[in-house]
Amino acid sequence: ASPEVMVRCEKGRLQLSPIAGTRRRGRDDLEDARLAEELRSDPKEQAEHVMLVDLGRNDLGRVAQPGSVNLERCMDVERFSHVMHLTSRVTARLAPGRDALDVLAATFPTGTVSGAPKVRAMEIIRSLEGRARRPYAGCIGWLGLDKDSVDLDMGIAIRSMWSREGHLFWQAGGGIVHDSDAALEWKEVCNKSAIMRLVLEEGDDHVPAHR
């Protein structure tokens, strides 16, 4: 599975790691390399990823020291058991006088599960989805209690399974942009949830774990 870092702060160093752009893993190394290159060169995936990186930089900028926001890496292909993603890393230095709650307020919800512009995107999501997401796309993590150091590590509640009243459930989704294709978005959702189906011995043969 590939849970995403929502925001991390260690001794005043902030980090976001946007994930946007997905392909399944290949059945062998040759297919895996082909799918990685397809992902890396897809204009739709590139545009979506750059938009979310910019949003992440803006979010960190709200609580960062002026001039400290830095894009450490951009659009690397990162491989997981069933899928590969385009990933980036944005860092910054926390501004004096800011605390962990300021960091959470500036970054939650992350743009990769809300969209941009963030407030308007959330309004559209609420009108279209018709029900609460509950834990899905929220955040899970910890906040340090040291008054002399701001430390936190929050992950996005995706690729996660929940138990309620004896029932297991999970959710998966994809970012919808102007150039999205409904069939491809559905395939992405299936690929993202493959690990959950495999855990429950319901894995599909066409989405194998890469070995």
Functional labels for PLM-detected ranges:
Residues 1-211:
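Extended alpha-helical targeting/anchoring segments
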